[in-house]
């Protein structure tokens, strides 16, 4: 890692400041749309709140943002970057060598982040469109919630529909729009507080603690379920670290926090001034002069779309990382933008669209969605805390300090989890079921991979070098291909899957000029692209280890083309002159990739549980991307061969021959 790269990552700039506003803070920046509304409605309405309730609520919000977002994520988690990348899977790659069980919190955290995030577009866009109820001239239309739902669904259809084309063309406006959004939050909130400056007493944590145990708080500790809505975007802040750099987050977060806090204070001041008016509108929109509300709704809708876009892009990145870490099935990934960071996964896109649309149709109002929102993200934060503890110890923090610090955050987040648990019966069960389904898929995929590693037999390539040379020179066999390439998941030193040698020598002897054995290894660094070659003392057998970062596409032919050129230029691989070609001077022959698919047999070594794992994994494979697409082989010559999973199972089954009995009269 060069000093210049490190400096750029930690350095802030004006452009980086604006970009960070558009990428990092969409979720947490749109929380003022619905957080105060949730608090007031759960208390029984505007006319049921008191000054002490409002002060306590604002104090709880301020200190939640301070403890969780500022201290845990901005000051601690942002230092846990994996070569400038953040997020729970990046954090896991930093600590996974410490203990194999750490894969569990990583899978749970990733699954809950994905499941709860599916609600973000629904709740933010619906909340923004519901603001039209407060707009003179449009209120009579949008008092009918069906019209709100239709408008929301149209926006979601467009939003998810444009993902396949890339969002770079609209991404350029995200930063400026969010700058206007946060500026409006801050300015409007400040002017609303001018008549009730006592609201700033909420900075004192006494009011927060007092409200939790006050009889004026009708919900008791469960009020924290609504308070938590203010900080649900903190995990996304960490996940987007690699997109904007640590320095830009350090500089932009104080501005964002100030604007958000002023917005909450402004809404609180409006509530205090209008608690006897009987107005039951969302405080966020009601606190703005009526003539400005249509512009505010437009701005809020744009902010909601930007927040949703950040969530969708984050989900693609999260799934992509999980696939490369071999804890999630392979799905087709495309790159519609000009950079690797802008990716698109069609299956995930439309699953997210289906879940989001069903959420809108099932819950109908943002108030009902808020009742289910936030439960799963508390689990994500707890899992991040577990991984952070091991990271701090690994980096040299005294164990007692790491344990105490993370125990404090775990306690705070566990209290939020308990407070949010009531949401399970109000729709949170849907999010939990989705999270459990994702965890189940991750577990099956990970466990299936471990079972294969446990049972598949490996052989030493050196023991078969002579046979392969004889086959190469045996003109009795037709030339199968100039270059035959085998992709192996397991290749250590000269040991290789028995199924590959079985394919070359036994199934149908494959005569070629050069045999390639390629193994792709995913590294902890996000953007690594390196390789290591072993010619095994020959010019016809090549072992290639590709080391690719967990965010790099695994398009093997592109890398192999470069490797072949390097080997020929260095004289390690003979040139393959072509007699017939449309490319003058072409000295590289044709290639065929052989993919071996291992299928479960009734092998005796497998326990019933292991057989269930492998059969379930095989079922999941039917809806996933083929290895041919995953490795970028769709434009290459490919042969798919099926072999039984357990080639080492040679136990003889008992069977007797029936011998005819001679006729007694003969």
Swiss-Prot record:
The keyword Membrane applies. InterPro entries: K+_transporter, K_trans_C, K_trans_N, Kup. This is Probable potassium transport system protein Kup. Transport of potassium into the cell. Likely operates as a K(+):H(+) symporter. HAMAP family: Kup (MF_01522). It is found in: Cell membrane. Keywords: Cell membrane, Ion transport, Membrane, Potassium, Potassium transport, Symport, Transmembrane, Transmembrane helix, Transport. One of its GO terms (cellular component) is plasma membrane. GO terms for molecular function: potassium ion transmembrane transporter activity; symporter activity. It comes from Streptococcus pyogenes serotype M28 (strain MGAS6180). The chain crosses the membrane at residues 16-36, 58-78, 98-118, 141-161, 165-185, 221-241, 253-273, 299-319, 343-363, 373-393, 399-419, 424-444. The keyword Cell membrane applies. It catalyses: K(+)(in) + H(+)(in) = K(+)(out) + H(+)(out). Belongs to the HAK/KUP transporter (TC 2.A.72) family. Pfam families: K_trans, K_trans_C. It is a multi-pass membrane protein.
